[in-house]
Amino acid sequence: MLYLDASALAKRYFNEQGSGVVAARFESGERIFTSILTFAEIHSAIARKFREREFDSQEFIRLRDAFQEDWLFSISKLDLDLKAMIALPRLVESYSLKAGDAIQLSTAIWLRDSLLVGVWSGKAGETVEFGVADNQLAKVALECGLQVFNPELEH
């Protein structure tokens, strides 16, 4: 199972280092998760790049529609409820994390722990990889016992 935060998922829509690796993970058919917070983060990133004239209105519509199609059909969404936020207080007290990063990490930790106790069904021995393209957040995720997938470091 792969949990993608917005920094990693954005590579699916923007031609950046690691874009091909993220595309391959989608094409592999593996189950991909993210927080509903990511919906706002990716829409915001697409709109910001359009406002900054990184692409024209046709590309804006194409990217927005591609994301919305993935959101509806390819991504499993995790709610921001108290269960998913259980690790958040400890994370922000122990590490210098922005609120959004702490939410993403807490949600990924909840997914991993839920898999361990059988809330989510997976293949025997399946684990959760935390997909992130932010080195500081990746380091914290490793310290929290998550496996990390950084698309910028993959070949």
Regions found by a protein language model. Give the residues of each.
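Acidic catalytic patch
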Residues: 38-39, 71-95, 102-111
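Helix-adjacent hinge/juxtasegments
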Residues: 49, 53-83
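Acidic, PIN/NYN-like endoribonuclease modules and their adjacent C-terminal/linker elements
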Residues: 1, 110-155
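Short beta-strand scaffold positions
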Residues: 4, 34, 79, 99-102, ...
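Short active-site oxyanion
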Residues: 29-32, 74-76, 125-129
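Short glycine-centered helix-capping/turn motifs at secondary-structure transition points
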Residues: 53, 95, 115-118
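Amphipathic alpha-helical segments within well-ordered protein domains
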Residues: 7, 43, 47, 89-92
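Short, well-structured N-terminal submotif of metal-dependent ribonuclease cores
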Residues: 1-38, 49-63, 146-155
